[in-house]
Amino acid sequence: MLSSLSPYMANPRQTFTQVLNFALVLSTAFMLWKGLSVYTNSASPIVVVLSGSMEPAFQRGDLLFLWNRSPRVDVGEIVVYNVRGKDIPIVHRVMRTFPDVPGKDKTKKGGKQGVEASPSSLESQKLLTKGDNNLSDDTELYARGQDYLDRKEDIVGSVRGYIPAVGYVTIMLSEHPWLKSVLLGFMGLMVILQRE
C-alpha cells in the first residue's frame, strides 16, 4: 500500500496541487450553497423529505427547492419549518392562517401571558400546518406552549419545486454513518491518486 503512494510522495508539488484541487471543489460547493441561501433568503434552500407524512404529494427521499422571499404564506401552500429548539426540517401544508390582532393576549418567548402586541409585531403571520397523510394538525409537533408557527421565526421556506427520489442518498448516509465514512474516504483517495 505504501509503495503505491511513494511516487506521490516523491513529487510534493503534484501532491500539493491535487490537495489544492480537492479544496477548490469543496470551497466552490460551499460558495454555491451560500449563494443559493442568499438568493432564496433561506438558511436551507434545498431539503430532503424524511418521512411519509406528505404522501401522495411528496415521497420520502424527494428533494425540495425552497423560496423564502414572500412576506405572506397562503392556505394550501406547502412549507418547511423547524420546531423551536430542534433542527429537524418538517414539510407540511398550511391549513390555516391567524391574523395578529392588537389588544389580544399574546404568548411571548418564555411563555409570558398578557403582553399586548406592538405595531411592529403585527408584521409576522401565524400559521397552523398539517401533513397530507396525517389525521390531525401539527400542534403536537410544535414546541411546548406553541399553538401556531410564526412566519418569520419558524418557516424555513415555501416549496417551489422538487426532484423525486434524488435525496434518498442523504437518507441512506444519515441512517448508515459508516457509509458516509467509506464514501468520503473513497473520494479522498480518488483525488490523491488521480493522475494528470
UniProtKB/Swiss-Prot annotation:
Component of the signal peptidase complex (SPC) composed of a catalytic subunit SEC11 and three accessory subunits SPC1, SPC2 and SPC3. The complex induces a local thinning of the ER membrane which is used to measure the length of the signal peptide (SP) h-region of protein substrates. This ensures the selectivity of the complex towards h-regions shorter than 18-20 amino acids. SPC associates with the translocon complex. This is Signal peptidase complex catalytic subunit SEC11. The keyword Transmembrane applies. Residues 182-193 are annotated as: C-terminal short (CTS) helix. The active site is at 53 (charge relay system), 92 (charge relay system), 138 (charge relay system). It is an enzyme of class 3 (hydrolase). The chain crosses the membrane at residues 15-33. It comes from Ajellomyces dermatitidis (strain ER-3 / ATCC MYA-2586). PROSITE patterns: SPASE_I_1. Residues 118-133 have a biased composition (Polar residues). One of its GO terms (cellular component) is signal peptidase complex.
